[in-house]
């Protein structure tokens, strides 16, 4: 795939992590995709590798826990024929009444326009603070 096609694919996927995104966003994930949250499992409850089905189930559960959903905005995309990098922000009202304003970086590996590997970097301190206050 071309860099522009890969940019469009990962933008659709990342926007689809929000409840404001396309319902077909997860179609961008290859059936054997692995999604890794790059965080320390000893300090952050969502970390490590997830298969495509596990990641989709995790996101659906997360969406259901949010009273007003979550809005994800892509702020920058860089891509070539097999890799893409995405910066994004999100905001959501949590069930505990706190607001989560998060920043992300995603590194993707693509084959044939499908994401085969995703690495998600988030501000874990910001997330822990919002969920625990």
Stretches with model-predicted labels:
Residues 71-73, 87, 100-105:
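Short, surface-exposed coil-to-beta transition loops
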Residues 81-90:
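A short hydrophobic beta-strand element
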Residues 92-100:
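Short, cysteine-centered beta-strand-loop-beta hairpins and adjacent loop/turn segments enriched
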Residues 106-129:
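Short beta-strand edge/turn micro-motifs at domain boundaries
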């Amino acid at each position: 795939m071309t860099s522009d096609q890969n940019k469009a694919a990962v933008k659709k996927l990342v926007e689809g992590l929000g409840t404001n995104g396309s319902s077909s966003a997860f179609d961008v994930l290859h059936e054997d995709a692995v999604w890794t949250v790059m965080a320390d499992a000893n300090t952050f409850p969502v970390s490590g590798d997830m298969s495509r089905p596990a990641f989709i189930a995790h996101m659906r559960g997360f969406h259901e826990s949010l009273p007003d959903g979550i809005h994800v905005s892509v702020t920058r995309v860089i891509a070539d024929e097999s890799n893409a990098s995405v910066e994004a922000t999100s905001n959501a009202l949590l069930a505990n009444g706190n607001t989560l304003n998060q920043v992300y970086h995603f590194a993707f590996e693509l084959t044939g326009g499908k994401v085969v590997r995703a690495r998600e970097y988030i501000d874990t301190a910001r997330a822990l603070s919002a969920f625990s206050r």
